[in-house]
UniProtKB/Swiss-Prot annotation:
Major place of residence: cytoplasm
Biased composition (Basic residues): 1258-1269
Compositionally biased residues, Basic and acidic residues: 958-969
Keyword Isomerase: no
Task of the protein: mRNA-binding protein involved in proper cytoplasmic distribution of mitochondria.
Subunit structure: May associate with the eukaryotic translation initiation factor 3 (eIF-3) complex.
Gene that this sequence comes from: CLU1
Region (Disordered): 958-989, 1211-1269
GO molecular function: mRNA binding
Name of the protein: Clustered mitochondria protein homolog
Biased composition annotated in UniProt, kind: Polar residues: 1213-1223
Length: 1269
């Protein structure tokens, strides 16, 4: 046993077996506390349903926070006595609610906001991947015939689906995994307990109905549960004699229902065979809320949902007090840090949940403002100790910089800084929890208030003019101590606060400066307040980041036409960090030295206040425009970074690189300029090749003439000797020597291809994101003009029908409008399709400084699936569509209708329009408070750094080994035998370090799971990175396991069709192939291929990558026919990408197809493809290029073989005709091949046959280029 562990023995636990010994033993760390022991007991079969019990050590009931090491003292073991404890109302309710979770009343789709939005299901298990077969890592694996058959079937299904559009049904998720094992379990109508029975220990009454329709009434008492004699019409809480009372409710239910235990076992078995990541309820995040939902919630009757609030005896929470109290906790160990982060993560999630619930109540007019006299966006609400205010320029604060538009930007920027503070965990300065909730076009800012700010301090009794006493509220004692005070419109200074804010300014690189003779270490727009708890709070942090002054000067200040909507354009935190890192690196200073240098800090008020400037702020803005944006885009165009799959991926890349989305227009213009440059460069190159080809043809003509002349002259000389009867001199018998100056050595051109998939793909994704954002702004603007949120679905359906339903019904109308509303008062209803399309162009120009063509809709229909734009709009505005067939043309509808059963066809009601308000619901779009685990991140960085260090050491060791081998081959001294033992020691040391690194990475993930729970977005990236680590080590089996986990979590956290999920599945396909599971790999590729139809433009390189990997897998099966089918599909895709232009990658692919046909002895098809390749190589590389000459030689060889085969066939026919009639070939025996030398040869062998042994290397090089277009 480790010295850091303690043996813990729990005695007296209930036993369900005949065994007398029911002791439970654990080895737990000394730093663990009693609550950890309770967690372990909750997984034991005998104690998992016990929620009310004491643990007694040395006759003392221990507290959950007691540390095991402190209880044990110098001892190495601890013994606890397990003792059930009497229930009270709170613990009884907790027991019942907890049991309901176990019994399946809470499905895997439920989270804290399920009443407002539908969560994403999972599809990963539906792929039915075969279990990991533990194939040997890195070694050759044998593929069974059965697996080959299944692979070929899946491969053919994928190939057949290539020319079909995205199928919306492919996103449907299966049935729920977690389903109730009871029909109902809720508090009965006889609650609350009458006073007479309260004295008898009764706490509450329950009613349970089994799946077999048996109903039982149950009494909950301090000693447990028993079935009583009550019925639906009679109250009698006395026990029924035939059933024994039980301490746990589940034991009672098992007793009264014969099939209940069977249902529970069935549910347990179902869950135990599934990864817990698929069904466990999230503890500190919300599940993904998809744009497409498979089905509407069943909403089975469950009284308990409405009853729980009544039995909730928790006092109203004060999130601010709790949040600040957590920061005050002492941290003396890693366990303390872990505990602190876990509490913080849970609190922040609970805050986000309450923020959403409160916001939705306000959106639905269910709450009263603090001042009942205010209405609309002027109203401020106080609910569950949180402040809710609409994001709008109500007081005119931002009127000079954009009004409401500026207010929207300020809210976003404030939240970004607050989330940075959540991560930093500063103690000297405090901040308020904040969230932003968007719903139906309106935005609410939710904050936990500064303590005392809204707390009434009493009233003054005054006498009014009529001599009546009136109670007048006293003003709060809390006011601004530092920074800008709105009430008096002046800047304030406080020495104590000035010192406290120093920690904040250092972390955000803010320069101390003067504004109106007041010294400040923060923005003059921010404010500092001492709460009644005497903690220093900082508010209004939006202007902490510097102004993007280059953008302001170009698009706002002194701009008269098409001015940007607001001046509140700031640089992102990522950009500031990157600028500072580069400046420090260039200076050669250490981080410690740089922290004291004013060269690396900035004035947050620069260019905010007239006349205030800062060189560093201007330099950062220039750095973004001149360096970061261009390097980021060039990185994508050069293939160093993947082209984004969709708008969300694009946004993630922009923000990670510190680029704001307002630069979308500039990004497209940059990409288009580079695209045009490549086109021109290619045109010049092709012109050069064309000229060189003419010169080569001229040389070839002259060369042939010269050779013919030499041959003729030689023949004439030989003839002279022959005519004279003399012996021909040996000199004349030798090969004719040509002048080297007359020869033309072959060249090797690289070609000049335009990366069409890179350029067109990036432009397409950027424009689609711009269009979707522009439409979101139109939706928001029009929604704000509506008198009721119930009208917003009408607006959404109307606009979607205008855009997408034109071919189904040109006369778009507002359907099913309630009689309370007048259609003539609805501004959106007056829009035409042309006006809407033009308005999108206006918004794109205004917000992204880009001129969309008036045909943008038609252009994007050619670039993407129709559903790509619908998806993008839905995600941004919070629309959840039902996954069903939508009809965009009459022809599509009639085809669908004819496919239905004849009996049903007559009952079908023709839809009036493509979309109806019954096809979707609206959900809140949440930008919540975020938290990151620093302790888990530190462990991860340590582990990853160690992995990288070991990898470098292994590369160096391998290099030395190769050098040693080379030296030995050259006859030099390769070193003494002692060197081998040294290498072995070094290898052992590296293995030890690697194990240590992997342990650190595993511990980091374990900490994340402890802090955030088993379902959280941070775990998705962690498991994916861990999978990549194991992949680098060649341990594919483990890599696949972790990648599977990442995929499952990604589906639940991000969605089944998110770019994160697609990226993970793409990795998984490679890993499955790497470990030899070709069927699994094909299944995953099939899923990726279908998702790419929805997410990405048709020209996206991800589609090419799917076929590349599929071809690699097919090659391992040695089925050349399926390989040919794959490459033919790839050729089709390459032509589609280039607009039918036959480019070099297409030629290389045709050459590969020719290889395969040759190996099948199908010379006619081989000739067809090699001729096509030769023609392309001639145009792209030149007639004198080695590749072109090789293909030409190959073509001639194949032609010769075909001619020979034809001659042999004629000869065989002639011989057959002369044979006696009774002599024939044996039935069923095929004639031997005419070209046995080529039959069934590999591609490399064929090239060696044609070109010699050097061919295979060049072939392999050419294969790598086939993705370039």
């Amino acid at each position: 046993m480790s010295a850091d562990n303690i043996e813990v023995i729990v005695k007296g636990t209930p036993s369900y077996t005949k065994s007398k010994n029911s002791d439970i033993k654990y080895q737990l760390g000394k730093e663990s506390n009693v609550s950890h022991l309770r967690t372990f007991l909750s997984f034991e079969e005998s104690t998992k349903f016990y929620t009310s019990y004491d643990l007694i050590e040395n006759s003392r009931v221990v507290d959950d926070e007691d540390v095991l090491g402190d209880l044990a003292g110098n001892g190495s073991s601890l013994t606890f006595q397990f003792k059930p404890k009497a229930y009270n109302l709170v613990t009884a309710v907790q027991h019942i609610v907890g049991l309901r979770e176990t019994l399946g009343f809470s499905s895997e789709l439920e989270d804290g906001i399920s009443e407002f939005a539908i969560s994403s299901g999972s599809q990963f298990q539906d792929m039915s991947l075969e279990p990991n077969s533990e194939k040997s890592n890195g070694s050759e694996t044998t593929i069974s015939d059965q697996e080959k058959v299944k692979f070929l079937q899946t491969c053919n299904e994928l190939l057949e689906s290539t020319n079909t559009d995205f199928n919306i049904a492919s996103l449907k998720t299966g049935n729920l995994l977690v389903t109730p094992v009871l029909k109902s379990l809720h508090f009965s109508a006889y609650n609350p307990v009458p006073a007479f029975y309260k004295n008898k220990g009764h706490l509450l009454y329950l009613q349970a109905s089994t799946l077999e329709n048996e109903t039982f009434h149950i009494t909950t008492s301090i000693s447990g549960f028993y079935v009583n004699k009550s019925s639906s019409v009679k109250f009698d809480p006395s026990p029924k004699d035939e059933f024994e009372p039980k301490f746990n409710l589940i034991d009672l239910l098992t007793q009264v229902s014969k099939k209940f235990h069977q249902h529970v076992t069935s549910l347990r078995n179902k869950l135990s065979s599934t990864d817990s990541a698929q069904y466990v309820k999230p503890a500190s995040c919300f599940l993904s809320k998809p744009w497409l939902v498979s089905q509407l919630p069943s909403n089975n009757g469950d009284f308990m949902r409405t009853q729980l609030e009544h039995f909730n005896n928790d006092d109203e929470r004060n999130f601010c007090d709790e949040f600040q109290a957590i920061k005050d906790l002492e941290i003396n160990s890693s366990y303390d840090r872990l505990k602190n982060e876990k509490i913080t993560a849970g609190l922040i999630h609970e805050f986000n949940s309450e923020a959403v619930k409160g916001a939705m109540a306000i959106f639905n007019n269910e709450l009263t403002p603090i001042d009942p006299g205010t209405t609309g966006e002027n109203a401020v609400y106080f609910h569950k100790s949180l402040i809710f205010s609409f994001v709008a320029d109500v007081s005119g604060t931002y009127s000079s910089i954009g009004g409401n538009e500026a207010a929207y930007a300020v809210a976003n920027q404030d939240l970004q800084i607050i989330n940075s503070l959540n991560r930093l965990g500063l103690k000297g300065i405090r901040h308020c929890l904040t969230a932003i909730i968007d719903y139906a076009g309106h935005r609410l800012l939710v904050q936990s208030p500064v303590p005392g700010l809204l707390t009434p301090v009493g009233v003054n009794i005054i006498v009014d003019e009529e001599d009546k006493e009136v109670a007048e509220p006293m003003e709060t004692l809390i006011s601004v101590n530092y920074g800008y005070d709105d009430f008096v419109a002046t800047l304030k200074f406080d020495e104590k606060f000035h010192e406290k804010v120093c920690e904040f300014s250092k972390n955000f690189y803010l320069k101390e400066h003067k504004v109106e003779e007041v010294d400040l270490r923060i923005s003059s727009k921010s404010k500092g307040i001492f709460g009644v708890d005497q903690r220093a709070y900082i508010l209004d942090l939006a202007n902490t980041n510097p102004v993007d002054i280059e953008f302001v000067k170009a698009h706002y200040d002194d701009v008269k036409e098409n001015k940007y909507p607001h001046r509140q354009v700031l640089l992102r935190r990522e950009l500031v960090e990157r600028w500072r890192a580069e400046k420090i690196a260039a200076s050669g200073k250490t981080l410690q030295e740089a922290s004291e240098d004013v060269s690396f800090i900035y004035n947050p008020d620069a260019y905010v206040i007239d006349g205030v400037e800062d060189e560093n702020v201007a330099d950062m803005s220039k750095f973004l425009n001149d360096t970061v944006l261009t390097l980021f885009l060039e990185d994508i165009l050069k293939g160093n970074s993947n082209i984004p799959y969709d708008g969300q991926h694009l946004t993630d890349l922009f923000h990670t690189n510190g680029v704001n989305m307002r630069y979308l227009g500039k990004a497209i213009e940059f990409v288009k300029a580079k695209y045009e440059d490549q086109k021109q460069e290619r045109a010049k190159y092709l012109s050069k090749i064309e000229q060189e080809n003419k010169e080569y043809q001229d040389w070839e003509t002259g060369y042939l003439v010269k050779v013919e002349k030499l041959i003729k002259e030689r023949q004439e000389e030989i003839n002279k000797y022959v005519q004279q009867g003399k012996e021909v001199p040996s000199k004349l018998k030798e090969q004719i020597q040509l002048d080297k100056a007359d020869l033309k050595e072959p060249v090797r051109n690289e070609g000049c291809t335009v990366e069409v998939d890179q350029f067109e793909g990036l432009i397409a994704v950027c424009e689609l994101e711009m269009i979707a954002r522009s439409i979101k702004h139109i939706f928001r603007q029009q929604s704000k003009k509506l008198s009721s949120p119930t009208l917003v679905p009408h607006l959404v359906a109307f606009f979607l029908n205008l855009l997408f339903g034109k071919s189904y019904n040109e006369s778009v109308t507002v359907e099913n409008l309630d009689a309370l509303f007048d259609i003539n008062e609805l501004e959106f209803a007056q829009y035409t399709r042309e006006q809407l399309i033009e308005e999108v162009r206006v918004q794109a120009k205004l917000r992204f400084r880009y001129d969309l063509t008036s045909e943008w809709f038609d252009i994007n229909e050619k670039r993407f699936s129709k559903y790509a734009l619908i998806r993008a709009i839905a995600q941004k505005f919070g629309i959840q569509l039902i996954n069903k067939e939508y009809f965009f043309t009459k022809e599509q509808y009639e085809k669908w209708k004819q496919a239905q059963d004849k009996k049903l066809r007559s009952k079908i009601v023709d839809p009036k329009q493509t979309f109806s308000i019954n096809d979707f619901s609206l959900r809140p779009v949440i930008k919540g408070a975020e938290f990151q685990s620093l302790i888990a991140e530190e462990l991860w960085i340590q582990g990853a750094s160690l992995v990288n260090a070991v990898s470098v050491e292994e590369e160096e060791a391998e290099k030395k080994k190769e050098e040693s081998k080379k030296a030995a081959a050259d006859g030099e001294d390769a070193g003494s035998s002692g060197a081998t033992s040294k290498e072995e020691e070094q290898a052992k040391e590296r293995a030890k370090k690697m194990n240590e690194a992997l342990t650190l990475l595993g511990q980091s993930i374990a900490f994340r799971e402890d802090i955030f729970g088993l379902v959280h977005p941070s775990l998705v990236s962690s498991y994916l990175l861990l999978s990549n680590m194991y992949s680098r080590l060649g341990q594919y089996s483990q890599a696949v396991t972790f990648c599977n986990k990442a995929a499952l979590l990604s589906e639940r956290c991000y969605g089944v069709d998110s770019f994160e999920t697609v990226r993970i599945l793409s990795n998984l396909a490679y890993l499955e192939y790497g470990q030899g599971s070709i069927y699994n790999s094909a299944l995953v590729l099939k899923k990726v291929h279908e998702l790419l139809k929805l997410l990405a433009p048709f020209v996206h390189s991800g589609r090419v990558n799917v076929f590349n990997l599929l071809f690699q897998i097919a090659a391992s099966t040695e089925d050349k026919k399926v390989q040919i089918k794959i490459l033919n599909k790839l050729s089709e895709l390459l032509l589609k990408i280039t607009g039918s232009e036959e480019t070099l990658p297409y030629g290389q692919n045709e050459s590969r197809i020719a290889n395969l046909y040759t190996s099948l002895d199908d010379m006619s098809h081989a000739l067809s493809h090699i001729e096509k390749a030769k023609s392309i190589f001639s145009k792209e590389l030149g007639l004198n290029d080695q590749t072109t000459l090789t293909s030409k030689q190959w073509s001639e060889t194949i032609k010769g073989i075909i001619t020979k085969q034809q001659q042999e066939k004629k000869l065989a026919s002639a011989q057959q005709a002369t044979k006696p009639a009774n002599i024939s070939q044996k039935k069923g025996k095929k004639s031997s091949s005419s070209s046995p030398a080529l039959t069934n040869k590999s591609v490399d062998e064929l090239l060696q046959f044609i070109e010699g042994p050097g061919a295979s290397k060049s072939s392999k090089k050419s294969k790598k280029k086939h993705t370039k277009n």
